[in-house]
């Protein structure tokens, strides 16, 4: 049972100025003490150098003492000791105590000078000295995080990356680039490049700088030829043009943006997504799916041209991964298209890492109408050649008002109804919904994935549901 809430402060009472006066001056000291203590945290790689500094200082002092007494500086050392004698008081402040005080002052001066040199160097690199220990601790911690490969596109993938970057910097996002609408479609047609839109969203999600993220996502509202484009899309198009292709420009992009992790297109070859429908029709172009699929349904999707190649960096990341996450995102336009690239599908099939499918919260009008969770998993298995080891499904309830709004558009909640025993054994439940929306909460989703990775997966039971 939770504790009762604390009573509200008595605003009628005068403030305790004595306590305030005593607290304010100590706050900077407390913050400095906390920062100093953080330098001693495990894993920073700092304590070993502090220990080496202490040992070398002691050895150097002893060696210098030996040199002064046995070498040409002996007369000077004698004069120095005689001069210090005037500060000694026999029985009260002996000569050795004077030496200890001088030694402590010298050591403090040396440490102060080293600190100021470090602060000057940090300022020169653009790092605030006050936050240096926090940045170092964060980067060291994140560098030991899970090696995870995410596959997908759209808002779902960028949401996932926003949450994952607080747990690990060993992230590789493999992004579907078959979009042919909007700014991406215009740049793709004009420059014969892959669609950059979802790549831009992922770079913004992994950015350490909120200002840079806003800049990448800025969409021009005016200007001939610029209207409708985002700055990030234009940046990727510029680097692709300058380097002769997006594949060769990826390293430059990562160095410029300095994001946590890596973002790669599923292929650097412009491809068109083709849907084969149950009524025998074929639709070419992702942007046409939502309008032209109804009243039929998608049986399969494929790429034109077939068998595009994948980047070597993507295949290496899949081989080294400790977890492969599919989604969240549109089943037929974000997740499966990346799995249609033979090299990626083969690498995922052969990977010893668990494959986790993050199920959508709702069906998508015009794309997954009438499909159950079993249909989603079967579609992935059919295109990939491997069944996901785990299926992560939200057990949070969508607010009725939000649910009604989606139902008016033809979307329904995706549930476990009708699932077989095998699928039920793979499902893991967790509260994943962002309050007031029908979207995954980035932090909740990342925490659920980390729980799967950290130890034996925990099963959450849906209210009123039985296997």
Swiss-Prot record:
Domain of life according to the entry: Bacteria
CDD domains per record: YvcK_like
GO annotation, cellular component aspect: cytoplasm
InterPro entries in the record: CofD, CofD-like_dom_sf, Gluconeogen_factor
Residue segments, region Disordered: 1-27
Compartmental location: Cytoplasm
Keyword set, alphabetical order: Cytoplasm
Gene Ontology biological process terms in this record: regulation of cell shape
Molecular functions per Gene Ontology: LPPG:FO 2-phospho-L-lactate transferase activity
Composition bias type Pro residues, residue spans: 1-12
Family: Belongs to the gluconeogenesis factor family.
Role noted for this protein: Required for morphogenesis under gluconeogenic growth conditions.
Record protein name field: Putative gluconeogenesis factor
Organism: Deinococcus radiodurans (strain ATCC 13939 / DSM 20539 / JCM 16871 / CCUG 27074 / LMG 4051 / NBRC 15346 / NCIMB 9279 / VKM B-1422 / R1)
């Amino acid at each position: 049972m939770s504790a009762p809430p604390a009573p509200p402060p008595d605003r009628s009472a005068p403030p305790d100025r004595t306590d305030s006066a005593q607290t304010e001056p100590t706050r900077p000291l407390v913050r400095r003490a906390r920062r100093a203590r953080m330098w001693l945290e495990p894993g920073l790689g700092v304590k070993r150098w502090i220990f080496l500094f202490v040992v070398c200082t002691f050895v150097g002092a002893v060696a210098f003492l030996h040199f002064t007494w046995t070498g040409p500086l002996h007369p000077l050392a004698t004069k120095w000791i005689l001069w210090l004698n005037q500060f000694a008081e026999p029985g009260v402040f002996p000569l050795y105590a004077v030496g200890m005080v001088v030694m402590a002052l010298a050591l403090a001066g040396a440490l102060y000078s080293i600190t100021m040199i470090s602060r000057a160097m940090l300022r020169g690199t653009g790092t605030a000295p006050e936050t240096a220990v926090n940045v170092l601790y964060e980067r060291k911690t994140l560098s030991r995080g899970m090696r995870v490969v995410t596959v997908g596109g759209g808002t779902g993938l960028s949401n996932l990356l926003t949450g994952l970057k607080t747990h690990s910097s060993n992230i590789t996002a493999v992004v579907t680039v078959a979009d042919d609408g909007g700014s991406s479609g215009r740049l793709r047609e004009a420059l014969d490049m892959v669609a950059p839109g979802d790549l831009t969203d992922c770079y913004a999600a992994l950015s350490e700088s909120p200002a840079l993220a806003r800049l990448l996502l800025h969409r021009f509202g005016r200007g001939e030829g610029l209207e409708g484009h985002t700055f990030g899309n234009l940046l990727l198009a510029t680097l692709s043009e300058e380097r002769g292709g997006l594949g060769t420009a990826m390293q430059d992009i990562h160095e410029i943006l300095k994001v946590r992790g890596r973002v790669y297109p599923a292929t650097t070859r412009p491809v068109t997504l083709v849907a084969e429908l149950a009524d025998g029709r074929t639709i070419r172009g992702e942007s046409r799916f939502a309008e032209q699929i109804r009243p039929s349904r998608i049986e399969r999707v494929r790429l034109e041209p077939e068998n595009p190649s994948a980047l070597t960096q993507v295949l290496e990341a899949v081989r080294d991964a400790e977890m492969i996450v599919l989604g969240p995102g549109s089943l037929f336009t974000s997740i499966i298209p990346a799995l249609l690239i033979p090299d990626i599908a083969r690498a995922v099939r052969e990977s010893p890492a668990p494959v986790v499918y993050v199920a959508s919260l709702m069906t998508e009008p015009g794309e997954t109408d009438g499909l159950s969770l079993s249909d989603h998993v079967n579609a992935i298995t059919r295109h990939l050649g491997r069944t996901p080891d785990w299926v992560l499904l939200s057990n949070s309830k969508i607010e009725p008002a939000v649910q009604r709004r989606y139902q008016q558009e033809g979307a329904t909640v995706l549930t476990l109804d009708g699932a077989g025993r095998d699928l039920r054994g793979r499902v893991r439940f967790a509260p994943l919904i962002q309050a007031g929306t029908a979207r995954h909460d980035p932090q909740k989703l990342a925490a659920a994935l980390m729980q799967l990775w950290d130890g034996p997966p925990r099963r959450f039971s849906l209210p009123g549901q039985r296997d």
